[in-house]
């Protein structure tokens, strides 16, 4: 599902041109719709906003864990990146929920795993390593376009900025917070991503 919203210019003409171009270029699963009625527009946006709740409530032991959920890539690489994400999940024995903000190149990617299953946990780690490598090297992207580095992406930060810039960032943090009292482990941590969850006993996705 792709929602495109216009707020300037000859909106009717622009929308018609976009629909024709998309319908010509891609095999659509259903006919494209142009909605001018505010009630219909609101209904379509409700579908978009329901994606995340729907994904995380999927039944079964495998849940949509958010450990690779906020990548951003150059906009002209988005189609290739989407294909990569679908294939990445498949090659690691699962499927994934994918949604996001395509105009920004920002994707929310949530593969389904059960981290309390040792084999699934190994798959999660392998997927994360391949994801990080491809995102940074092949797609020239970054691990977070919206949600921030936090704890879950902290170990990837040195690979994003390089040792020199990362070192400067750490020294600034240490100068302002020498005792490490402010948000310990956030952004600057060598620990594996999964330790930030404080254990993997919970089956509730994050």
Language model feature labels by segment:
Residues 1-145, 150-206:
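Noncatalytic alpha-helical scaffold of FAD-dependent oxidoreductases
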């Amino acid at each position: 599902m792709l929602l495109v919203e216009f707020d300037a210019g000859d909106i009717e003409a622009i929308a018609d041109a976009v629909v024709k171009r998309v319908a010509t270029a891609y095999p659509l699963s259903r006919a494209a719709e142009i909605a001018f009625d505010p009630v219909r527009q609101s209904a379509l946006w409700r579908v978009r906003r329901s994606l995340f709740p729907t994904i995380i409530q999927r039944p079964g032991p495998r849940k949509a864990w958010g450990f690779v959920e906020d990548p951003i890539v150059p906009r002209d690489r988005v189609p290739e990146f989407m294909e990569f994400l679908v294939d990445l999940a498949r090659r690691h024995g699962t499927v994934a929920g994918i949604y996001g903000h395509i105009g920004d190149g920002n994707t929310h990617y949530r593969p389904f795993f059960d981290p309390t299953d040792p084999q699934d946990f190994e798959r999660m780690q392998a997927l994360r390593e391949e994801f990080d490598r491809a995102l940074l090297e092949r797609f020239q992207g970054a691990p977070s376009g919206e949600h921030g580095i936090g704890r879950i992406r902290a170990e990837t930060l040195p690979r994003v900025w390089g040792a020199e810039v990362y070192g400067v960032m750490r020294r600034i943090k240490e100068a302002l917070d020498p005792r490490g009292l402010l948000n310990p482990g956030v952004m600057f941590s060598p620990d594996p991503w999964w330790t930030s969850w404080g254990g993997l006993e919970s089956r509730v996705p994050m």
